Each structure stands twice: as C-alpha cells, then as structure tokens.
C-alpha cells in the first residue's frame, strides 16, 4: 500500500485515519476541502491538481475527473500492457480510494429545497472514483464508510496491505453506496423534482393572442407521479429475531427520509427489542392516531384497531379506548397523540401491552412504565398528521404495487345526506369519528361508535353483512342511538336492516352501489339518517 486518494464530504475521523496512513509511509493525494483539512492538521498531502497536472475548474465541478487519476485507479497490476501504458504517460498507481459523497439525501430532506440546490449536491467525481476503485477491487481498496477506518488501518498496520476478502467486502459496500446514492437522486427527481418543474411550467405566462386565433400547441397533461423506472433505496436498521412467524427470517429497513411522524424514526426509550409484528402493528397504531386533532388513544391488535377513543384529556381517551374492548387489547399496542402523563401511565401499567407509543413521556410516567421491564416505549416527537412521504407499496410475486397514501381528510360538510332524516350535529361528529377509524380497519370493515368511542369493530370479513353483524354484536345494547360507518358501499339493504334492528341512529358509507336506492328506501322506512361520502376506503 503506497498511495491513497482521499476526498470526503463527511470528514468524521478522516484526520486520524489519514495520519495513520501517513505514519505507515502511504503517500496521500486529495482534493479541495479535504486537502485543506489534512494540510491544516499537519499531514503530508499533495493536491490532485498537482498530480493530474490540471487545475480544478467550473467552480469545483471538475476536480478528479482526470485520466491521470482514473488510470491510476483502474490499471490492473497483473496486466503488462496496463503497466506499460502507465509508465509511458508517467501515471502513478493509486492503491486506496477513500471517498464519501455530497449529502444529496440530507439536502432534499428539507421540504423547501430548490431544484438548483438539489442539483448542486449531486456528486459526479466521487461516484466515478468509487466505482473505478470497486471495479478494480483485486488491486485497489475502496472505503466509503467512516466506520471502516479503524479496521482498515488495523489491517494495514498488521500486514501492510488489505486481504482479498477485505477488498471484496469494501467493494460490495462501495457499489451499494453508489447505488443508494443514485437511487435517492432518481427517486427525488421522479417525485419532488418533477413536481417543481411542473409547477414552474404551469406558472409560465402565456403570450397574448388575438381573439379567435389558433391557440397553438397545448401544454401536455400533468405527468404521472409514477416514474417509468422506480428506484428504491433503504438502509438496514436492524436484524429482527424472525418475521411474522418464527420460521421466517426478517430485518427492518429505513428509507432515510427525515420528515413526518413515522414509526421508522421512533425512539425506543425502554423495553425489549422490537419484533417484526411489533413494528407492523406500531405503524398501524401511529397512522390511525394521527387522524385526530383532539386527544386520542388507539389500541391495535394484528394491525386492526380494537379500541379507539377521543376525549378532553389523554387519560380519559385511553380509559374509553380500553373500555371499548377490554379483551382484545390484551397483548396489544397503544398509541397516544398527546404526551403520556402519570395518570395515563398508571392506567396503562395495569394491562399487559407490547408497546406504548406517544409523542413523549413525562418523567413521572416513565417512572411508572419502566417498572414493566419488557414493555416497549416509543417516543415519536410532536405529531405531524401528514401521511408518510413517498408511496404506499405492497410487494407481490415478481412485482410491486405502488399507490398514493389513503390520505384524504374526512369532511362531513361535503357529505351528502340521502335520507329523509338528517343526522344531528352530535351524530355527524360521531359519524366523522367512526369513518376515520373505519379507514384503518381491514376490509370489509364496519365500525359502530358513539360519543367519540368505538363500540364495535367488524374487520376483514369476506362479506359486508358479516362485518356488520360482528360489530353490532360486539356493541350490544350500546348500539342503540349509536352510529355506524362502512368502508365501502352496501350492495344490498341488509346492513341497513341489521343496523335498524340494533337501534343504530345514523349511517355513513361511500355510496355508489347500483342498489343504493334500495338501501336509502329501507333506511327511510326504519327512520335512519344516512349520508354518502363518495370516497371508498378499502384496506387489504
């Protein structure tokens, strides 16, 4: 190991690493800011421009893109022709490339970032050097991760070189690094970048033309939000003990996005390691509790809500959510949209739960809850009620289903009353509450609710009437005077009839069945109020 090229944006640990290389007699060449950092630390270093015989130009856009650099990286030591050509042109070998890239992902995490700012953080020379070194891994080491510095330096001190397995491992990490980098760029440009360009195009002022004149070529329709090639980049957060079942291997990955309230950025304060099912259920709980502005508590079991409630205080909201289904909550997950206080913690501690999620936990609440050594506590920070960034995706054999998130807000003002009886203001509030919950229940879904509390949840049934019967049976006598929400239309009036028999006072459903009139007529006969939303909420 005689010569190393170092060019890093993230300078964490680079001075110590470079000093270790210099102590081993390795010549160091470097670019721009890295050169100045190493020189300022008193480390012997030559500038790439000196080695290449060509200065940095275009405001630093061209620094290392030189044949004198890339030939020194790509030359195969065992190839006599390669070595002869290097000698002919006076090019020296480069044995180690240490590079990390401009922070594109961190830059575009800012929602206000401009297209120009994003473009300036697209690294060109760095990925080229990394790929060149990785391609020639049999002769060249490549380091893209500062966490690797100590191990690389230790091996060089011990043997004077890097073993083939080490270089192969570094090569693999390098290609993963550049693939993730390019994927992040392509993904952002295909979504937010495209939106910015489309907005600019729509904002252009059309030239004036005489009345009746040919308008000329028309602007194309807005482009699809779905790119022709979808590049996805995820970073492994942790290995999981197993998947949904013990015989399935599993891991958890993050997309690295910085905005919003999402489970991938929750901070675990206490308890056992999260499992695959824990994370899946925690995601379901968090996305549902984000629906509510008022204090709300959500209990989840197998990704379905079993108890949901809103109230003036978070302690009261949890009490109501627990009382909604005192059986199913056992071993479940609870999410709160307000910080957990001592009163709420005392109530939570009396039940066996897997996880409690909250924006934060008061010190006195932590004192209570941490007595349960296995209870996982997740803090998610102030609640951002927006959906996760990007797309909602589902893997299928040989492909990927991609859609926008079901993020439409429930707006009772826009709902259409279709029966002679209209819901009262109190019933309308409960209908809105019930529909927010119903949106997060596996289809076919029916929710019975009253006074900001679920009374019955019919989930995942193969026909709608069975979902309704389950929810109404769970509600029992409490169904009288309550409301009922359905995630999709009624194909027959049977759900209306079952609701009427149970004493339901008002119904909300999307409408859209060819038999809507039959359901409306039956509701009128039973004296029920019913409104149509026009929006279906299937969930599978």
Curated annotation (Swiss-Prot):
Question: What protein name is recorded for this chain?
Answer: Bifunctional purine biosynthesis protein PurH
The entry's keywords? Hydrolase, Multifunctional enzyme, Purine biosynthesis, Transferase
The record's NCBIfam families line, in alphabetical order, gives: PRK00881.1 (NF002049), purH (TIGR00355)
Extract the SMART domains matched here: AICARFT_IMPCHas, MGS
Region Disordered: start-end pairs: 204-224
Protein family per UniProt = Belongs to the PurH family.
Q: Which organism is it from?
A: Symbiobacterium thermophilum (strain DSM 24528 / JCM 14929 / IAM 14863 / T)
Q: Name one GO molecular function term.
A: phosphoribosylaminoimidazolecarboxamide formyltransferase activity
Superkingdom of source = Bacteria
